[in-house]
Amino acid sequence: MINNKMKTLSDKYPTKMAVTSEIINLKAILNLPKPTEAFMSDLHGEYDAFQHLIRTGAGNLRQKINELFSGEMTPETMQAFAFLVYYPTERLALKHKALSENELNQWYLTTFKRMIDLLKFVSTKYTRSKVRKAMAPDFVYITEELMYGDVANVDKKRYFQEITATIIELGQADALIIATSHTIQRLVVDQWHIIGDIYDRGPHPDLIVDQLTQLPAVDVQWGNHDILWFGAASGSELCLLNLLRICARYNNLAIIEETYGIALTDLVRFAAQHYQANSAFMPVEDPNQGPLTHAEKLKISQVQQALAIMQFKLELTVIKRHPEFNMDHRLLLSQVDFKRRILHLNGQEYPLKNTCFQLVDPENPEALTAEESQIIADLLAAFTRCQKLRKHLTFLIDHGSMYRIYNQNLLFHGCLPVDAQGHFLTLTLANQNYAGKQLLDFFDQQIRSSFNHPLHQANLSTDLLWYLWTGPLSPLFGKNAMTTFERYFCPDPETHVETKNAYYSLRHDADFIQQLLSEFNLSPETGHILNGHTPVKKGHDPIMANRQMIVIDGGFSKAYHHTTGIGGFTLLYNSYGMQLVTHQPFTTKADAIANMKDIISTRRVIDQVSQRQRVSQTNIGAAIKTEIEQLQTLLTIQPDH
């Protein structure tokens, strides 16, 4: 009897010849060089910087141009050509302004040849079929003729000349250059890995997700800020309030109102009625944007206060609902002496400043007012019903996970909670223990469950999304406490301290990293762990533990540039090994195009193989080998005709 898999293959390859042809094709693919992977993290909504790295293949495209044209072009010419491939539409517009018609036509002829040569060069790892799928449908025939034809053949010389001349004559030269540039961009990196935090304070995480949907192969490892958005769309009131408060703090409420069409009118009105100007809640302004007016600052301050107080009230409710979270030390509103304006914390008394507790009942601090309850309910309904947001987050759920194992690399955003000796810490829920890999698997399942049932709002799965944001054993948070309350109200800086999990000090140790690799059934000798989440401070090394631990926070968030001294890191992994790419802060798209200002500054080889890796040694290769085995089985039962 033929099983379902064999039936599907039999329908696809109905004869022995069809099966034989596919086996030959797949065995040949196994011997192609391993395609290039690129890793980036912590995009934080900074779309222009993200898109620049996508267009440049995280620096891989410029490296290909250098390899191909060094000695043929000057460095200045290579830079100009690179930016034409990065930003073809914009750079073509500048060429039209700078050149006469005859000069432009001559430039087209030179550029066609260079474009086709580069396309050939970046296509060498792929089958013709895969390259064809990356091409614009309107130009497949012409591009393949120019790529695979023998241009040196005297008999065909006039044939190729006529193709290029007619392209120019019919006004299709720009369209061909744009289409070829996009094909090159798609081929220069085969697989993109995004290690968390697409969302946060930046203005356009929505555009980042839209761009990700257009990439041929991408996976996402969720970050702590992504979880807030999953939580809000899954019915978590606390995730919603944290998300909105952070948007207000960084003057980014436009993403809520303008991008996702969620009205904040009632919230703004309520905040204006009950809260006054408060210096602790003034928004953080982006120096690249115009200054806010006094009225704008006041409004945002009021909104942020309203959201913070509702958040602190609900924290009491959820922490009491789940004593197994072991978060009683965060029952902060219930530890306030409202008459004396004192916080009782860790056996100490701390004076409070800039308080805004007028809607807090000292006898029942977790109680929401009727108006607060209504505002939260309305906002939560808007978030869970927003189709555009649901579409974006569904893509991240479908293409994402808490961690990914790919080609002997373990990818996750934050940490694995451990004690000072490196032993996994255990989270106990409903008499079940979760630690190490099991902890990540458990959270992965809970996220999907909550997201798929957004109307179930006061259950464990939904509350665990908030725990992932701030809980002491959250692998995405990685600290003992999130001191938001203290930073708003306690002048004493000792209350602001957030102690990192021991993972972050132990990850420098090779034995510890090899222990983690073994936990995930990876080779302790050849595997790597790739993290995001923590910006690499100036003077610190992102490569640790005998080159097996790599931190690649992309540094997209402008707020961290003063800490890191650079823009951040991305990682390239090709058939020759791994390269860590350092990049400088991205200014603006307009500046990059006008001044041909790239952000890639240095490359550092991390791991170089003695023999070039092949597809057969990759995850894709393993899947192909399985398919070959199935096809060989099918070959024994398939008819000749």
From Swiss-Prot:
<keyword id="KW-0119">Carbohydrate metabolism</keyword>
<dbReference type="Pfam" id="PF06874">
    <property type="entry name" value="FBPase_2"/>
</dbReference>
<dbReference type="GO" id="GO:0006094">
    <property type="term" value="P:gluconeogenesis"/>
</dbReference>
<comment type="pathway">
    <text>Carbohydrate biosynthesis; gluconeogenesis.</text>
</comment>
<keyword id="KW-0378">Hydrolase</keyword>
<dbReference type="InterPro" id="IPR009164">
    <property type="entry name" value="FBPtase_class3"/>
</dbReference>
<dbReference type="GO" id="GO:0042132">
    <property type="term" value="F:fructose 1,6-bisphosphate 1-phosphatase activity"/>
</dbReference>
<dbReference type="InterPro" id="IPR029052">
    <property type="entry name" value="Metallo-depent_PP-like"/>
</dbReference>
<comment type="similarity">
    <text>Belongs to the FBPase class 3 family.</text>
</comment>
<keyword id="KW-0464">Manganese</keyword>
<protein>
    <recommendedName>
        <fullName>Fructose-1,6-bisphosphatase class 3</fullName>
        <ecNumber>3.1.3.11</ecNumber>
    </recommendedName>
</protein>
